[in-house]
């Protein structure tokens, strides 16, 4: 930062989640430095906060090998152009938000030109392809991590990392209102309620929906009043789930929801879900859960050799023990899933203990991440 110009922060976000993080960071920085300038690759939320978009975020938001290969020339052109233009601009700090395949190389290019770089949101290097940590260390001055065990991993390799807490933990209340959520969904306050979340990807919904439905059928034999809510992320996943349900359980009554995953978790006594961010959200909703996951045999064989962690779900990784039951591959079948869920639906000691631990873990990662990230950027800019 010089006397002649305002604090200048360059940012690159590659998808909607990054746009949300970038907007929160910009907002927190503007509160401290009102005349700061923000430029880079931005989505609508970042632009609404005043970020000047040299490229639209959608340019980077490609998924899948085929799509990436089809856009590779354009992506490489954008990265080369940003390397040149940021090099000329000399921002006080560059912040690459997630999108590691694009951003980490860009961060390395900029660091060689003397520009300070931050990578915001650690890739899952602690879980697999751990040698990426060395490239990240060469490319960045600082990694901003959502979770404490991520910082512990970087510390082991002497890569500067700051634990800032998780934005989702900031956004969700420590004590959610179950009855209010039930009112929104039309679920009676005194009924037993189970949430089924078979994933956001097509392959997950295809692999898990039938077994999740069969599990719910078994549970309703014990709890005839069992209300079952199934939030689905979009119309495509809903159509897919409805097709599978028509084959497996055509007359079985469930509440299908368009989105509303968070409300479903808060409203429910227990949840059966695929792993991923949903498990963290379910923990923050204080909803006892069982994780069920299945993938193609070769993919699972490969994952077992590549993944270096003892657990797949974030609640267990945060707790450092099997806090929630994980039933994977051949273990992910209706009898075993139902047996794991039954004591949670009873809403007794097991559920209460899990709820209390979820609350403790929530407090650990509720650190006002936007403010922490802004503070880290300003400290590096000085």
UniProtKB/Swiss-Prot annotation:
Protein name in the entry: Lipid-A-disaccharide synthase
EC number assigned by the record: 2.4.1.182
Broad enzyme group: transferase
A single MF term (Gene Ontology): lipid-A-disaccharide synthase activity
Reactions this protein catalyses: 2-N,3-O-bis[(3R)-3-hydroxytetradecanoyl]-alpha-D-glucosaminyl 1-phosphate + UDP-2-N,3-O-bis[(3R)-3-hydroxytetradecanoyl]-alpha-D-glucosamine = lipid A disaccharide (E. coli) + UDP + H(+); a lipid X + a UDP-2-N,3-O-bis[(3R)-3-hydroxyacyl]-alpha-D-glucosamine = a lipid A disaccharide + UDP + H(+)
NCBIfam families per UniProt: lpxB
Pathway info: Glycolipid biosynthesis; lipid IV(A) biosynthesis; lipid IV(A) from (3R)-3-hydroxytetradecanoyl-[acyl-carrier-protein] and UDP-N-acetyl-alpha-D-glucosamine: step 5/6
Record-linked PANTHER family: LIPID-A-DISACCHARIDE SYNTHASE (PTHR30372), LIPID-A-DISACCHARIDE SYNTHASE, MITOCHONDRIAL-RELATED (PTHR30372:SF4)
Source species, domain of life: Bacteria
BP terms from Gene Ontology: lipid A biosynthetic process
Family statement drawn from the similarity comment of this UniProt entry: Belongs to the LpxB family.
Function: Condensation of UDP-2,3-diacylglucosamine and 2,3-diacylglucosamine-1-phosphate to form lipid A disaccharide, a precursor of lipid A, a phosphorylated glycolipid that anchors the lipopolysaccharide to the outer membrane of the cell.
CDD domains from the UniProt entry: Glycosyltransferase_GTB-type
Keyword tags: Glycosyltransferase, Lipid A biosynthesis, Lipid biosynthesis, Lipid metabolism, Transferase
Taxonomic lineage of the native organism: Bacteria, Pseudomonadati, Pseudomonadota, Gammaproteobacteria, Enterobacterales
């Amino acid at each position: 930062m010089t006397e002649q110009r305002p604090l200048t922060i360059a940012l690159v976000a590659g998808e909607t989640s990054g746009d949300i993080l970038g907007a929160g960071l910009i907002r927190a920085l503007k509160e401290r430095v009102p005349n700061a300038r923000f430029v880079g690759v931005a989505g609508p939320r970042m632009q609404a906060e005043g970020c000047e978009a040299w490229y639209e975020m959608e340019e980077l938001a490609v998924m899948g090998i085929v799509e990436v290969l089809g856009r590779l020339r354009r992506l490489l052109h954008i990265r080369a152009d940003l390397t040149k233009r940021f090099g000329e601009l000399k921002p006080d700090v560059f912040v690459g938000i997630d999108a590691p395949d694009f951003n980490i190389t860009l961060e390395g290019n900029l660091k060689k030109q003397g520009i300070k770089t931050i990578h915001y949101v650690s890739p899952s290097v602690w879980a697999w392809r751990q040698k990426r940590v060395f490239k990240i260390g060469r490319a960045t001055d600082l990694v901003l991590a959502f979770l404490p065990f991520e910082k512990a991993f970087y510390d082991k390799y002497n890569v500067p990392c700051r634990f800032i807490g998780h934005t989702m933990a900031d956004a969700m209340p420590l004590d959610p209102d179950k009855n209010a959520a039930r009112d929104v969904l039309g679920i009676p306050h005194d009924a037993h309620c189970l949430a089924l979340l078979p994933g956001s990807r097509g392959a997950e919904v295809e692999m898990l929906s039938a077994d999740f439905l069969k599990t719910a059928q078994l549970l309703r034999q014990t709890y005839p009043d069992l209300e079952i809510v199934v939030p689905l992320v979009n119309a495509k996943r809903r159509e897919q789930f409805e097709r599978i349900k028509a084959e497996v359980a055509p007359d079985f009554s469930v509440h299908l929801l368009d989105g509303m995953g968070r409300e479903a978790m808060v409203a429910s006594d227990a949840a059966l879900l695929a792993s991923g961010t949903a498990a963290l959200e379910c923990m923050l909703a204080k909803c006892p859960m069982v994780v069920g996951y299945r993938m193609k045999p070769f993919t699972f064989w490969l994952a077992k050799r590549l993944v270096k962690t003892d657990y797949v779900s974030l609640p267990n990784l945060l707790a450092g023990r099997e806090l929630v039951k994980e039933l994977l591959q051949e273990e992910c079948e209706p009898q075993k899933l139902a047996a794991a869920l039954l004591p949670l639906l009873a809403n007794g000691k097991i559920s209460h203990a899990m709820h209390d631990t979820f609350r403790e873990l929530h407090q650990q990662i509720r650190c006002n991440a936007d403010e922490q990230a802004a503070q880290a950027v300003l400290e590096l800019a000085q």
